């Protein structure tokens, strides 16, 4: 049996109105992946005579978006010759940041859309920085709206230089910068004849070359629990996605912070593992599984617990401990000061955390310290802070286990900040 094509998750980022939705629309339109209900509507309206108009489709997508029905552009799939690609999100969704961090959807690559008319804008920088903070290591740049600058090579080069500077400063290397017009269909799926001066890949060709995501099988086992079920004849079945490591039948695993909270090890031997209703001897990173553990009951564990081997258990941060983190403030109405206690979302857990110290304010582009011990931090700032959880939780330093080292900070129904754990300080 031929090896299945690798699955790759991508996010679209970039400044508002630079053409993210149109680019996604064009990708789907030219690969014949427009949602069924839209095509049906088009045919019902007797619009057959007209050539199937891209503009009409984009209007429908936009209408549905404005009515609050996201045509799930989130989780839209299409194929390239060597990849299955899922567009897991596009900003503009309120929970974009939270989804990127806590979702079952860690993005493997980002497509940064920059309008040739405007060049790099504030959100271009913010989104690029966010992609970096969230550990998206592969980026593709689409310089859009080339039709609006008459397909001018000089203008493309100016914008390409701006973006390249920004991305190199953030540590990105080897990224394609592609001149496109999503509206006209140039260099998205079909090669453009209007820019003979460009001989690089189209957007879809660049997507086809996204490196296959590596499975972190050599890292310690971590399975954040999403739900816990009781199944007749089997017993308690925790369900979750293997983030790192390998789980085998017969392994002895422990759950945290459950063990810390109950002051006794919640642990046992793995009796069975199931995926898509089939039993399997082992599970690898990316697998969504249910598994049964001898001696672990339904009331012992819950969503937000993390399973690991007893030989290398998940790291617990208790209220007497603190952790140092680097954050970027995305959206706070006033300013964050010491004592602020919002809710931290990481993997499948949510715990209120208190800002204990503001150690330094950073230049978001270079990471250099611009101010020690600031009195406050506000929207747009990047900072090193010390946080203390109000109850025990599992979180890991991002250098060791990036999958469990990133978090979102939420308050008043919005994502206030995104960050990553630098180190953990154990209290006495």
UniProtKB/Swiss-Prot annotation:
Gene3D superfamilies per UniProt: P-loop containing nucleotide triphosphate hydrolases (3.40.50.300), Translation factors (2.40.30.10)
Region (G3): 89-92
Known EC number: 3.6.5.3
Region annotation G5: where it falls in the sequence: 181-183
Region span, G2: 68-72
Residues covered by region (G4): 144-147
Binding site for GTP: 14-21, 89-93, 144-147
GO cellular component, as recorded: cytoplasm
Main location: cytoplasm
CDD domains on file: EF1_alpha, EF1_alpha_II, EF1_alpha_III
Binding annotation for Mg(2+): 21
Stretches assigned to the tr-type G domain: 5-217
Subcellular location: Cytoplasm
UniProt keywords, alphabetically: Cytoplasm, Elongation factor, GTP-binding, Hydrolase, Magnesium, Metal-binding, Nucleotide-binding, Protein biosynthesis
GO function terms (MF aspect): GTP binding; GTPase activity; translation elongation factor activity
Entry-linked Pfam families: GTP-eEF1A_C, GTP_EFTU, GTP_EFTU_D2
Family the UniProt entry places it in: Belongs to the TRAFAC class translation factor GTPase superfamily. Classic translation factor GTPase family. EF-Tu/EF-1A subfamily.
Name under which the protein is recorded: Elongation factor 1-alpha
Natural source organism: Thermococcus sibiricus (strain DSM 12597 / MM 739)
This protein's encoding gene: tuf
């Amino acid at each position: 049996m031929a090896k299945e094509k690798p699955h790759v998750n991508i996010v679209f980022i970039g400044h508002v109105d630079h053409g993210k939705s149109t680019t996604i629309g064009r990708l789907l339109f030219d690969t014949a992946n427009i949602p069924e209900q839209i095509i049906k509507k088009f045919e019902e309206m007797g619009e057959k005579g007209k050539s199937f108009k891209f503009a009409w489709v984009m209007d429908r997508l936009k209408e549905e978006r404005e009515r609050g029905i996201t045509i799930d552009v989130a989780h839209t799939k299409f194929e390239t010759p060597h990849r299955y690609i899922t567009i897991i999100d596009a900003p503009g969704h309120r929970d974009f940041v939270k989804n990127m961090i806590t979702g079952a959807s860690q993005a493997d690559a980002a497509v940064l859309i920059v309008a040739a008319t405007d060049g790099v804008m504030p959100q271009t920088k913010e989104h690029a920085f966010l992609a970096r903070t969230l550990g998206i290591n592969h980026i593709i740049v689409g310089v859009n709206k080339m039709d609006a600058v008459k397909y001018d090579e000089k203008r493309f080069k100016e914008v390409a230089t701006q973006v390249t500077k920004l991305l190199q400063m953030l540590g990105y290397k080897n990224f394609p910068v592609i001149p496109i017009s999503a509206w006209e269909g140039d260099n998205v799926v079909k090669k453009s004849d209007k820019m003979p001066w460009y001989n690089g890949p189209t957007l879809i060709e660049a997507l086809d070359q996204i490196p296959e995501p590596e499975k972190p099988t050599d890292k310690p086992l971590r399975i954040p629990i999403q739900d816990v079920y009781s199944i007749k004849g089997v017993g308690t079945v925790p369900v979750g996605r293997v983030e790192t490591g390998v789980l085998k039948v017969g392994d002895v695993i422990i759950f945290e912070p459950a063990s810390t909270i109950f002051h006794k090890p919640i642990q046992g031997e793995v009796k069975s593992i199931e995926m898509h209703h089939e039993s399997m001897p082992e599970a690898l990173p990316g697998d969504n599984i249910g598994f049964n553990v001898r001696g672990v009951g339904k009331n012992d564990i819950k969503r937000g617990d993390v399973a690991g081997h007893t030989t290398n258990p998940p790291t617990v941060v208790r209220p007497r401990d603190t952790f140092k983190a680097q954050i970027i403030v995305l959206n706070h109405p006033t300013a964050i000061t010491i004592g602020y206690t919002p809710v931290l979302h990481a993997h499948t857990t949510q715990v209120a955390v208190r800002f204990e110290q503001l150690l330094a304010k950073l230049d978001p582009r270079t990471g250099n310290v611009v101010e020690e011990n600031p009195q406050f931090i506000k929207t747009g700032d990047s900072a090193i802070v010390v946080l203390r959880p109000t109850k025990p939780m599992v979180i890991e330093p991002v250098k060791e286990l990036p999958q469990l080292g990133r978090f979102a900070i939420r308050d008043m129904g919005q994502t206030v900040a995104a960050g990553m754990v630098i180190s953990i300080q154990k209290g006495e």
